[in-house]
Amino acid sequence: MNKSVVIIGASGHGKVVADIIKKSGDEVVGFLDDNPHLPKELSGIPVLGTVGDYTKYKDFMFVVAIGNAEIREKIVGQLNCVKWYTAIHPSAVIASIDTNIGEGTVVMANAVVNAGARIGKHCIINTGAVVEHDNQIEDYVHVSVGAKLAGTVSVGKATWIGIGASVSNNLSICGGCMIGAGAVVVKNISEAGTYVGVPAERRLVMISINEKNQGGVCVECNAMPFRNGRCAA
């Protein structure tokens, strides 16, 4: 039976998730998003209202299409008693032996999830990413485009693995980390923070202060806000 899905997040990422849903033979009901400046449609898909309107659509399934793990987790906590949709692109290769993918997770085109891998809830396994055998991926992790995790890697909650990054086998990365684009992780990471380079090393983040609102913008992450004396990454 085909499923009908409401997407939280009307953005480029949301459009990719919508495409996965359609290619899986399911129906996209529309988007919910708190941005008041959105048009009534995005790529021909209706914008139904704000996130708070979700109660009108409780007969349908939901998926959160937002890249920021902190926001994704906050929204998941706001949506009570909904059914979560797990979006897996038809071209993704998912091993049939001892593999588990949590609810609300998105697995994009040409990604590979191998035998024995466990992926938590509301994760993003992006285009062409490789999650090798016996990986343990906790909730809200984002494995970016083309990133590769070798066998028996564990990744803690809400860690972001940047585009093209590589993680050697039998390693552990704690939660709350940002692994920069192209970084190569060759040893365990036990302290949350931003890690860049080959081999990946922790980098102290510079802060640029916005004079208008006295807020901070993390120079390392650019788009991610600086909150409570530390980078939100």
Q: Language-model segments: which ranges?
A:
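Hydrophobic, well-ordered beta-alpha structural blocks that scaffold small-molecule cofactor pockets
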Residues: 1-42, 48-56, 105
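Short phosphate-engaging motifs
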Residues: 13, 71, 185
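Phosphate-bearing ligand-interacting subdomains
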Residues: 36-95
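Structural signal for interior beta-strand "rungs" in well-ordered beta-sheet cores
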Residues: 87-203
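Intrinsic disorder/low-complexity segments
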Residues: 223-224
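Basic polycationic patches enriched in arginine
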Residues: 227-230
